[in-house]
Amino acid sequence: EKNVYKNYAGNGGFLVESLIRKALLAARFKTLKILFSQDINSESRVLMYRNITERVLKVVPFLRLDGDPYLVVTEGKMKWIYDAYTVSDRFPYSQTIPRFGNYVRNSVKIVIDAYEGSMDFFIADPNDPIILTWKNVFPELFKELGEMPEDLKKHIRYPSDLFTIQAFIYATYHMKTPQVFYNKEDQWEIPEIDNKMMEPYYMIMKLPGNTTEEYILMLPFTPRGKSNLSAWMVAQSDGENYGHLRAYTFPKQKLIYGPNQIVARINQDAEVSRQISLWDQRGSKVIQGTMLVIPIEESLIYVRPLYLRADAGKIPELKRVIVGYEDTIAMERTLEEALAKIFGQDALQSVARSNDKKKDPPIKTLSSSSNMLLKQSDYRTIKNMFERVMKRQEEMNQKLSHHKEDLKALGKALDSAVVVE
């Protein structure tokens, strides 16, 4: 393998141009290498503030940024989309949220070119008086959302931080009866898994009553002080439905297991417990991945990957997939095998056959060995979510591996360093 060198051809940054600017850069970065380097000439470009968060805040420090920027591909280019908020702590008669105050609006969509670093600021909420004031201060900085290219608009999604705030508020204010509200008789909570509050996650699914699948952001609720599930809430992101919030409640007389109850059932399952104990005895470390909560009809399917990392290994390896549905727990090598164990092999084969057909499949497929139902759209939802989690886990593992290598290199450098006093 050989190293491949390529010259930067973008318009990002600024030209070095002169010896004076070169000297100023050397002083700015406190190194003489810039001044005496033959590789840096008048046509060289200096790219500063390449971290997108730092870059954005240099321009709009008065905006609060979402914690989850996302990268999209549009018109052959890679661009970051950052959701930004206008916030205040002086809105009267409004509940305060830590870090955001008591007034929050997703007023701006920021688009950053990943190659050149150019930024565009689109006003997403023209009714927000704060962002309109800032627009009057900087009239050339902000653009109307209608000026955003149509292909880029298709990639816009509902921001996760705003949705978390709305879910937190709705957990209390969904109660409409004054007496019930005053006594907090039907208070909800965002569930916790492994002592950490669940974060909302994106998925593609067909909402109840809809005929097509769509991209949504979802979060479940549990009753206050209890572990069973009471409802789930979604934010829609597609087209004209963008920004619409929906809440679906489960019948109170029906027990729907919550995340912690499923975790307890997984840990109590004889097969799962035996396999984990066997791996632990061999000196390997068992890592339980992100728990996925996927609505299916009037119930839920839980999916959790199981990783195994050897003592000498760097990256965990996916070993098993655990699926929970109602009273059944299944652990298999693949998601398909675990679903087949719960719903029956015939149901999965029917779904697989319908995936190969161009026309719409039957609405439901019934397993001959089980009375449980699995829709093709439900199967695609589960499969898509699982693949997204696997991809994200792989990216995190690669980053962790690079960090470990950098730390080892730093340790070797420190060990070989000569300290002069």
Regions found by a protein language model. Name each.
Residues 1-420:
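Soluble extracytoplasmic regions of secretory-pathway and membrane proteins
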